[in-house]
Each structure stands twice: as C-alpha cells, then as structure tokens.
Amino acid sequence: MLLSKINSLAHLRTAPCNDLHATKLAPGKEKEPLESQYQVGPLLGSGGFGSVYSGIRVADNLPVAIKHVEKDRISDWGELPNGTRVPMEVVLLKKVSSGFSGVIRLLDWFERPDSFVLILERPEPVQDLFDFITERGALQEELARSFFWQVLEAVRHCHNCGVLHRDIKDENILIDLNRGELKLIDFGSGALLKDTVYTDFDGTRVYSPPEWIRYHRYHGRSAAVWSLGILLYDMVCGDIPFEHDEEIIRGQVFFRQRVSSECQHLIRWCLALRPSDRPSFEEIQNHPWMQDVLLPQETAEIHLHSLSPGPSK
C-alpha cells in the first residue's frame, strides 16, 4: 500500500527550494504600505519572538498571519542576495517557501523603524498539534503515522533547502482540519544547515538532545531526529517523555499508553543516546511502523471530519 502512495506523495519530496532572487520587485516598483494591503485582526499569540495576529489580504480576502518581530529581540541576522540585512527567519522562510505544502509560506515582509513584519499563510480551519492532542488525548497510531510522515517530509524538505528548523515540536505544527495537511511553522530558532557542529540553541529544551544538555554541542541532522522521536512519543502517548535535564541525559523511555512494539522500537531508535546510533530520515521512512501511510485527505475523512473542529487560530 505504501509503494502505491509514494507517487502521490512525491511532490512533497521533490518540491524545489525557493530562489531568493525570484521575489525581488521589478525595477522602479515600490511596495505598497502594509496598511493598504492587509487588514489586521485579533491577536493569535505572543512570546519572546514578538506577536502574531490574524489578518486578511485586502486584494483577495486571503487569510494570513501577521507576525511582528521587534528588532531588539532579534539575535540572528542574515542577508538577502541584494545585500538587505534581515532576520535570519526571513532568509530561512524564503529558502523553504516553494510549491511544497508542508511548510508555512512567507508571502511578504516589511521593515519598520523598530521591527519587521512577516506575512504568512494561514489555513482555515486550523489547530496546532499541541491543542489537538490536549483536546483529544493520545492519537491512534494510524493517525499518528500519517501526521508523523508529513512532519518528516517537511523536515526533509527544509534540509534539502539547506535549512535546520531547530524547534520541532507540537506547538509548531499546524493541522488544516479540512484537508488533513500539516504545516511546519516558526523558523525563529532556525539556522542554515551545515555538516559541522552547532554550539548554540534557541529551541525548546525538552525537545533538545542529550548531547546539547551535556556538552552544549550537537549536529543538525541527528538533533532533528531526536526531536522527531520526542514528537512521535508525544503523539502516541499524549505527552512528552522527558521534563528535566536528568531525564533527557538518562534517556530511559517509559510508555504510558498501549503502543505497538514497532512504534516503540522506532521511538527508542530516534531517542538513542549516541547521535550516531539514530536513524537517518530514509531509515525512519523505511521502518516497518511507517508502512501503509494514509494520504492527508484520507486522514481528514477518517479521523478529522468525524470530530468537532477545535477553535480556529
């Protein structure tokens, strides 16, 4: 069954990375002001990154998310091909925003004297995976498998585009409740992917690998696999496996729900204490538990449409 669906999912894997030059304005064309293009709605959320509001694009009533980031809160900067200095988040989003549907798209951005404003796509109706699990509890393995496959494809797409997300967690995954499609969001902790070691980390500590807790060093790909293991455990058990540094370093996984032996094996493999013992993305997708993956629309029809949608964001 899985092999018959690979072609249906192939567009996710082969989507091209965005050419940063492609979004430049034509010579002599000035960008219209933010206020004339977008109508700002209620606050969706706020934190150390700034604030995110719902909004509407005036030209076509397209739902958008409007993210305000204060300049004095930006710790990592990047540069566009034309030399413009922007938050690294803008650089990363431009690299991954393409025809691939599993990563949130950056539609536009604006610079203000004291902040940057990012215009992002906003599916409707939508709920993040954290709220979805909080309301419904541990997911059935069939649903968890579909969700996990989509997240894995999103992370693979990012890596193929040279981007390391560094904050893979349930709060940063949106579920389109109509289509059954997941989208990876919030690249504010991300970095350009490299083969050498990282010595900085701004993501969520309980999703971070033991090598970061112990040595403040990690490699991007193996750290991402650890976070994916935490996420899969969260899906099938309803909560994360570790809360404290000592638990992360010890790495002992106890299952609070009935979980199949194949799923347990995959989780424990992703959560191997030695980074070199963790699977590659390809090995995860070839794992026995990852076979017979539902397509997003099948997921919506079987698991989502029969449920009452949670509150939209």
Curated annotation (Swiss-Prot):
GO terms for biological process: apoptotic process; cellular detoxification; cellular response to type II interferon; negative regulation of apoptotic process; negative regulation of innate immune response; positive regulation of brown fat cell differentiation; positive regulation of TORC1 signaling; protein phosphorylation. Its cofactor is Mg(2+). GO terms for cellular component: cytoplasm; nucleus. Gene3D superfamilies: Phosphorylase Kinase, domain 1, Transferase(Phosphotransferase) domain 1. Its EC number is 2.7.11.1. It is found in: Cytoplasm; Nucleus. Keywords: Apoptosis, ATP-binding, Cell cycle, Cytoplasm, Kinase, Magnesium, Nucleotide-binding, Nucleus, Phosphoprotein, Proto-oncogene, Serine/threonine-protein kinase, Transferase, Ubl conjugation. The keyword Transmembrane does not apply. The modification Phosphoserine is found at S8, S98, S261. The modification Phosphothreonine is found at T23. It holds the Pfam family Pkinase. The active site is at D167. ATP binds at L44, G45, S46, G47, G48, F49, G50, S51, V52, K67, E121, D128. GO terms for molecular function: ATP binding; protein serine kinase activity; protein serine/threonine kinase activity. It catalyses: L-seryl-[protein] + ATP = O-phospho-L-seryl-[protein] + ADP + H(+); L-threonyl-[protein] + ATP = O-phospho-L-threonyl-[protein] + ADP + H(+). It is an enzyme of class 2 (transferase). Autophosphorylated. Phosphorylated. Interaction with PPP2CA promotes dephosphorylation. Residues 38-290 form the Protein kinase domain. Proto-oncogene with serine/threonine kinase activity involved in cell survival and cell proliferation and thus providing a selective advantage in tumorigenesis. Exerts its oncogenic activity through: the regulation of MYC transcriptional activity, the regulation of cell cycle progression and by phosphorylation and inhibition of proapoptotic proteins (BAD, MAP3K5). Phosphorylation of MYC leads to an increase of MYC protein stability and thereby an increase of transcriptional activity. Belongs to the protein kinase superfamily. CAMK Ser/Thr protein kinase family. PIM subfamily. Interacts with RP9. Interacts with HSP90AA1, this interaction stabilizes PIM1 protein levels. Interacts (ubiquitinated form) with HSP70 and promotes its proteasomal degradation. This is Serine/threonine-protein kinase pim-1. It comes from Felis catus (Cat).
